[in-house]
Amino acid sequence: MNTGISPKQDDASNSNLLNIGQDHSLQYQGLEHNDSQYRDASHQTPHQYLNQFQAQPQQQQQQQQQQQQQQQQAPYQGHFQQSPQQQQQNVYYPLPPQSLTQPTSQSQQQQQQQQQQQYANSNSNSNNNVNVNALPQDFGYMQQTGSGQNYPTINQQQFSEFYNSFLSHLTQKQTNPSVTGTGASSNNNSNNNNVSSGNNSTSSNPAQLAASQLNPATAAAAAANNAAGPASYLSQLPQVQRYYPNNMNALSSLLDPSSAGNAAGNANTATHPGLLPPNLQPQLTHHQQQMQQQLQLQQQQQLQQQQQLQQQHQLQQQQQLQQQHHHLQQQQQQQQHPVVKKLSSTQSRIERRKQLKKQGPKRPSSAYFLFSMSIRNELLQQFPEAKVPELSKLASARWKELTDDQKKPFYEEFRTNWEKYRVVRDAYEKTLPPKRPSGPFIQFTQEIRPTVVKENPDKGLIEITKIIGERWRELDPAKKAEYTETYKKRLKEWESCYPDENDPNGNPTGHSHKAMNMNLNMDTKIMENQDSIEHITANAIDSVTGSNSNSTNPNTPVSPPISLQQQPLQQQQQQQQQQQHMLLADPTTNGSIIKNE
């Protein structure tokens, strides 16, 4: 098909020369231009062509309003003649896609197909007179040219198709360098002479096959461009990237700086930095530097926090170790130097008397212990491997087998030893400080208890104690005062036996007065409370009976008296150890016995 135009003037009519299907979902900015821009496209470079498009976004709103008004006034505009200056240029106006014009009946579809066929035939038969037939409503706005004639302009969808064809044409010319000047006119003449051959060759051309997927007008424009030949008016073409992710085109990003900024900010887009506007490149690099600095600061802060936490943890561990070490040292010091609990004056006197009494003569061993020690050597000869528990069991078994006559000599020996012990004990206790005197109520109980027991022989200890408490409450206050005075005198005598705790003048300290007052108050409280009388009275009675039993035993052995003042404590302990060794070696020897039955 011979169009009669030069390759310099076919960039507005070529829709898609790379055999790529048209994507109608792409949205482009509605840029409107005069026809003179498309006629004079051969005298412009690609950069000038882009600069012209960058100046148009300000007029978009006004042109859209004009387009709406013209669509309402004239549904179709057609059969316009070109000026003599435009007869050498064949302008194609492809029909919009079916998504824009949706016919409601089959008759409208048939009319549209007939109009498209007439349009293609008119373009192929004549190069001088070009008539555009049956232009749809979407293309119904007109622009005034320099010659005064009205020509249809291009809407947004048509411009997107022309734009794709322009980029495709640039990429094709880049691979196939073309000739300029007279070479372009010679190619035009050869194309005019070979119209039929060009039409026949489009069926086998891949561009024609790709154009079949588009609308008929776009396919016709692609076939005309293939017939025109590879000649082009461009000698050096820029590197242009055709497609980009997320349906973003390189030229649209270059035309609108705001869209380029959005594309650079989107993580899913990958626009090359060379295609961005010059003013955005330093901004992006500065932003990246700021982000890197922020990341470095965050990392430094995290490292500092980790170091601080580690230091705190180490300090805590050191403090714990120091506390443990200090605690161990305190325990060792306590073990080496045990802390002696400070006792009151009364308690210290009682404890001192107990310790002194333990250092005195020991009680004699019983008849059973004397028998077991007498047969110990015999048992060791019979059972040399037997231990002490086994020997004691054998001795007890033999003791049970003895009759009373056989046990009598052992009991007589015990009586003689007891008489000796009693004499020595009494002499030793005279050297000891006296016992702490009992309170007034305990003195009254010790005196009245034998009479109460004779009067009530059938009653028990608790009932007898209650009777004594009732008599104490009924007692005359004058007699109670006498018991109190006797208690005070005995207490002073008891305190005088501990001169180291008195004042330098020999007067008792304040602790003794406190102890005396506590005993008096305790006696009065005991008399007021009947329940506490029973326990205290029973203990007092037991102490009295125990002292009487010791004093009334006639068979106590007599031994030479021993005084603590003559022998120090260490010598007495050594003597006790020697006596124990002697008993183990010879059980028949006389002396103090450690263990009682």
UniProtKB/Swiss-Prot annotation:
GO terms for biological process: cellular response to hypoxia; negative regulation of transcription by RNA polymerase II; regulation of nucleotide-excision repair; regulation of ribosome biogenesis. SMART domains: HMG. It comes from Saccharomyces cerevisiae (strain ATCC 204508 / S288c) (Baker's yeast). This is Intrastrand cross-link recognition protein. Residues 52-134, 178-212, 260-271, 281-291, 327-337, 543-556, 564-580 have a biased composition (Low complexity). Binds to platinated DNA and confers sensitivity to the anticancer drug cisplatin. Activate the expression of the COX5B gene. It is found in: Nucleus. The lineage of its organism: Eukaryota, Fungi, Dikarya, Ascomycota, Saccharomycotina. Keywords: Activator, DNA-binding, Nucleus, Phosphoprotein, Repeat, Transcription, Transcription regulation. CDD domains: HMG-box_ABF2_IXR1-like_rpt2, HMG-box_IXR1-like_rpt1. The gene is IXR1. Residues 351-361 have a biased composition (Basic residues).
